[in-house]
């Protein structure tokens, strides 16, 4: 089964996601399309529009962190692992401006005692602007 067809079966767990759902499923979604690469890492793209700003002409920091969190989540979803963000440490290195085209990347560093460690970054013109490290855990069965 390919990563993309495999993804569709797990994506239903959050089909109205504010970051990655289609505009049809959630009109307020950022509608980011993440792709799984052969090495298991994830890449996506995002165009910064005026509605995404916090400070004048700059991408809102909360949206930046959501893009990173979404990419890390997809690293796990593509592996058929549904996990929740337990910790997200974000570093803002340089601002992202309106009309920037952002490349989003993420990969899984590993898993220890049921905790997945992931890393993600936002780049503009191959320059790192924002980085994050995250820890994810599987939800307990109800």
Residue ranges and their predicted role:
Residues 41, 58-83:
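Active-site helix/loop of acyl-thioester processing domains in fatty-acid/polyketide metabolism
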Residues 1-51:
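Non-catalytic linker/capping segments at the edges of enzyme domains
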Residues 48-62:
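Short histidine-centered catalytic/ligand-binding loop motif
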Residues 1-15, 96-98, 109-142:
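HotDog/MaoC-like acyl-thioester-processing domains
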Residues 35-37, 107-111:
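Short beta-strand micro-motifs enriched in acidic
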Residues 45-47, 89-91, 105-107, 121, ...:
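Residue-level recognition of well-ordered beta-strand positions that form the cores
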Residues 71-103:
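Hydrophobic beta-strand-centered segment that forms part of the acyl-chain substrate-binding groove
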